[in-house]
């Protein structure tokens, strides 16, 4: 249901006001190809940017959200796509390691949006990440890393 609501908002409000939103917000096939040629690994981020863990998706909806983007990347670009980043990162928004493996068995790593220090004991399906912004400097990033290491 949340996916349908989000898609309705997108199609009936956002897309009407910004008809070229897809070109602005998403990478083109050429941009993705260039990134692959430069050596980047390409992962997925779900199809419609919903909270996977709290949406109570049917199996076909879960496949559409998690598996379809992976299949698309692998088919179009002839690559292995084994990583995903949850659109939202609170615990309620993510599948547990066990759930992700049982429901898809398709990924090796999954990233939340929690700013945590990843350790050897961190599940590969619940990795933290830091989302830098255009305002970040190397000094600010260093301070953030020190803060994360110190558990603050």
Segments (PLM) and residue ranges:
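Histidine-centered catalytic micro-motifs
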Residues: 41-51
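Generic alpha-helix detector with strongest preference for long hydrophobic helices that associate
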Residues: 13-16, 43, 65
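Extended, charge-rich helix/loop segments that form flexible
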Residues: 1-38
